[in-house]
Amino acid sequence: MSNATNNTLGSLLPQLEAAANSNSLYGGMVPNLRFNITMIVIWGILLTIHVVQLLMRQYWFSIAFICTGILEVLGFIGRTWSHSNVADMDAFLLNMICLTIAPVFTMGGIYYQLAKLIEVYGHRFSLLPSPMAYSFIFICSDIVSLVVQAVGGGLCGVAVTDGTSTTTGNHVFIAGLAIQVASMAIFLMLWFHFLFRIYISVRWEHINSRPISLSLLKISQTEVDYLYREKFHFLRLEPKRWVFHYFNLAMTVAVLTIFTRCCYRLAELVVGWDGYLITHEWYFIILDALMMAIATVTLTIFHPGFAFKGRSTSIPITPRHVDPETLPHTDDVEDILDTSDSKQFDIEKEEFQASMKYPISTFKQFMSKIANLFSSKKKAKL
């Protein structure tokens, strides 16, 4: 009798659980408590490390990575909160909004690193007319993506409140993520073009031939360094500077993992809010949480502040239409090094503000138009 009762209860448990979660914003899935608490701890540690690195290296653009850490912590707090109430809209929005936009800040920092690398290796390796153009173009693209996602989320929220279809809002939200993925795909092409130029093309130039052979690997970076920008040879050639030697590899790992994560998020929304991807947390764990963790840990170990000697070395981004190779060169490293920490920090701060000036003004104008649009529609209804 007891066995029969246990069997009956065992068969009913999945049905009871499904019924209890029928109002779940996660399509019936309950976020794993242990995993999400673990991620809060991990991101809390990474956030603390990046704050310390900012104070140690005074590399202004580290703030972008700190913003990512804060958003990831908040996002996983939202998922932990959702574990006890999967129908809580506040917890769900905290999770979705924070974890969705967090990679944008990491990519903003990465875009700026490519501009720095072009200054270190030479402008002739850049496909765009100015190193800062990479920051302008792709940060603007990310901001547009964020705005479109925000509009889509707003339309979904209004639809849920009014009890109408969320199809339009979903489509707008998907369009925002698609813009982000397309932007990253273009950046990846530019990034690999840059790597091809500094690792393959220079070796062809060095041997005055273009073989497609593994023999190119036998040519060391030291042998071809004369083909790079002379001014920063000390950054590239110092034997003990392993952080810089592997920095390009670290950047590649970070970009590819974040790109994988963004593709997953896009696929998740295309499948639907109650689709297979969003209702099976293992996909989120592997393709979102793990990818972002790998990217951030990589950028923590190979921090740009250490790679570029952020506390003592000035690498200003040259203005557009100015070729740094035509400027006076110096063999004296001391002319490049600046022992004034505050001065170097001010340089990084000015470059950060310059790179963000146009994107922020564009963002403000765009949001103003959106607000006016919703305001006019609200007045029309009244």
From Swiss-Prot:
Record keywords, A-Z: Cell membrane, Glycoprotein, Lipid transport, Membrane, Transmembrane, Transmembrane helix, Transport
Residue ranges that the UniProt entry lists as topological domain Extracellular: 1-34, 79-90, 157-171, 263-281
Source species, domain of life: Eukaryota
A Pfam family the protein falls into: RTA1
Coiled coil: none
Compartmental location: Cell membrane
Known role: Catalyzes the ATP-dependent translocation of sphingoid long-chain bases (LCBs) from the cytoplasmic site toward the extracytoplasmic side of the membrane (flip-flop). Involved in the establishment of the functional lipid asymmetry of the plasma membrane. Regulates intracellular levels of LCBs, sphingolipid precursors that are growth inhibitory at increased levels.
Similarity comment text for this entry: Belongs to the lipid-translocating exporter (LTE) (TC 9.A.26.1) family.
Identification of the protein by name: Sphingoid long-chain base transporter RSB1
Primary gene name: RSB1
